[in-house]
Curated annotation (Swiss-Prot):
InterPro entries: Ribosomal_uL22, Ribosomal_uL22_bac/chlpt-type, Ribosomal_uL22_bac/org-type, Ribosomal_uL22_sf. GO terms for molecular function: rRNA binding; structural constituent of ribosome. It comes from the Bacteria. GO terms for cellular component: cytosolic large ribosomal subunit. The lineage of its organism: Bacteria, Bacillati, Mycoplasmatota, Mollicutes, Acholeplasmatales. It holds the Pfam family Ribosomal_L22. Keywords: Ribonucleoprotein, Ribosomal protein, RNA-binding, rRNA-binding. One of its GO terms (biological process) is translation. It comes from Loofah witches'-broom phytoplasma. This is Large ribosomal subunit protein uL22. Belongs to the universal ribosomal protein uL22 family. This protein binds specifically to 23S rRNA; its binding is stimulated by other ribosomal proteins, e.g. L4, L17, and L20. It is important during the early stages of 50S assembly. It makes multiple contacts with different domains of the 23S rRNA in the assembled 50S subunit and ribosome. The keyword RNA-binding applies. Part of the 50S ribosomal subunit.
Length: 91
């Protein structure tokens, strides 16, 4: 059974977050948490929080055992960009 968790509108570059996500793809939950704890990247706490949310969803909503869970699929896409406006004379 697939359990999903989302983190929308996170203020970090997708390229930086993908470096961390690639480390935990396909790993057991305990191993992924250990990797995230000792990875000194700015995306690590964000991904760790997301992983804990997914585990909570699995345990609480679907009554799954936490020891049998692993990261099957995890990915990072680009979010919306903030519009930047530079007010000045245009003529």
């Amino acid at each position: 059974m697939k359990v999903k968790a989302f983190a929308n509108q996170v203020h970090i570059a997708p390229r930086k977050a993908r470096l961390v996500v690639d480390l935990i793809r396909g790993k057991q939950i305990k191993e992924a948490e250990a990797i995230l704890m000792f990875t000194s990247k700015s995306a690590s706490p964000i991904i760790s929080k997301l992983l804990k949310s997914a585990v909570s969803n699995a345990v609480h909503n679907f009554k799954l055992d936490e020891n049998n869970l692993y990261v099957e699929e995890i990915f990072v896409n680009e979010s919306l960009r903030l519009p930047r406006l530079f007010p000045r004379a245009k003529g």
